[in-house]
């Protein structure tokens, strides 16, 4: 039986290879997200998993010249349950100007797109709870701190209030 990561790789590899317009076999994480948006439920999360498993040089792009499916599968499994994957995919989904921060406007706009009826109240609440330094934007560190807080208090039921 195939692992989750093998299934993910089998799902996305043909699409990515087929969409290489200039045939240089180099992709940024944003390009991968765009490619996956058509056929994936959570393209940001899949892109982060793929990027982390392939980007050995830790630069701004990944290369498909030396793909080793078994190594990718092993690496994806290693990252699969790490909270930073979800944090990074959350940032990719909501950070429209690619500054690695989520502004009040970016969050509200995305919530409006998703059909949230009370996006202003929800956005205000999220920022009140997570923006600890009150900069007016959510950073990776803010989100990471919130995830750690939730993990510490995992016996309590924590959820956003209905607004």
UniProtKB/Swiss-Prot annotation:
Note in the entry: Does not bind calcium in vitro.
Positions contributing to Ca(2+) 1 binding: 95, 97, 99, 101, 106
Bilayer-spanning residue ranges: none
KW Ion transport (keyword) present: no
Name of the protein in question: Calcium-binding protein I
Record keywords, A-Z: Calcium, Metal-binding, Repeat
Binding positions for Ca(2+) 2 per the UniProt entry: 131, 133, 135, 137, 142
InterPro entries for this protein: EF-hand-dom_pair, EF_Hand_1_Ca_BS, EF_hand_dom
UniProt key word Calcium: yes
Single GO term (MF): calcium ion binding
Domain annotation EF-hand: ranges: 20-42, 82-117, 118-153
């Amino acid at each position: 039986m195939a692992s989750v990561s093998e299934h993910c790789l089998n799902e996305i590899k043909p699409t990515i290879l087929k969409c290489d317009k200039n045939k240089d076999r180099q992709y940024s994480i944003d390009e991968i997200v765009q490619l996956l948006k058509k056929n994936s439920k959570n393209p940001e999360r899949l892109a982060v998993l793929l990027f982390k498993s392939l980007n050995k040089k830790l630069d701004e792009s990944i290369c498909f010249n030396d793909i080793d499916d078994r190594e990718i599968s092993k690496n994806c499994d290693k990252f699969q349950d790490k909270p930073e994957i979800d944090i990074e995919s959350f940032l990719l989904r909501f950070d429209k100007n690619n500054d690695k921060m989520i502004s009040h406007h970016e969050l509200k706009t995305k919530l409006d797109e998703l059909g949230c009826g009370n996006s202003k109240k929800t956005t205000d609440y999220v920022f009140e709870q997570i923006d600890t330094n009150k900069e007016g934007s959510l950073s990776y560190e803010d989100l990471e701190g919130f995830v750690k807080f939730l993990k510490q208090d995992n016996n309590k039921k924590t959820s956003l209030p209905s607004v």
